[in-house]
Amino acid sequence: ADKEKILAADGLILPGVGAYPTAMAELERRGLVAVIKEAVAQGVPLLGICLGMQILTEKGLEHEETDGLGFIPGVCRPIPASKEQPVPHMGWNDLAVKQASPLTDGLDGQAVYFVHSYFTDVPIQYIDVTADYSIEVPAMIHKDNVYGAQFHPEKSGDIGLGILEKFAGLCKA
């Protein structure tokens, strides 16, 4: 992706599968961190999915401490392992809406698909939706025009498609 296309976009999606340090290193290598920050500062909506949500935080603790994009205060930490809930967290979990946002309408009690070993430890005012997985995992977070979904909406059937449609509605297109 080049700078002009990103800055001209009506919305941005940071997808994700992989590791926090690798993702941030690749964004830096491509010169995209500053461009993404500039686009968000100009009001372009940003949706981070899975790892894309995790790197919205200030730092991650996967393998090593790594600076994130810093859009949402907090740290990405390992999910504590337990006998009842294995890590990685893979599968369907029900959502609990904690506060309304443009993406959360109709999500309370709905099941979505997760694949992750880390969670975003962020202040409560940025947590829109949670899922119970031995701990209360932030499933959706947001601050201003920056949104994150820890689960994979693209793998979550009609519920997930609805979230993506709502995000598209936030974009200028």
Language-model-detected regions and their locations in the chain:
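A short, well-structured beta->alpha microelement
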Residues: A1-K5
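An anion/phosphate-binding loop that grips the pyrophosphate of nucleotide cofactors and donors
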Residues: A9
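Cysteine-nucleophile active-site neighborhood
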Residues: G18-M90
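Histidine-centered divalent metal-coordination motifs
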Residues: C50, H116, H152
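Pocket-forming structural segment of enzyme catalytic cores
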Residues: E58-S134
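Short, surface-exposed beta-strand/loop micro-motifs that present aromatic residues
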Residues: E136-K143
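Acyltransferase
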Residues: A149-A173
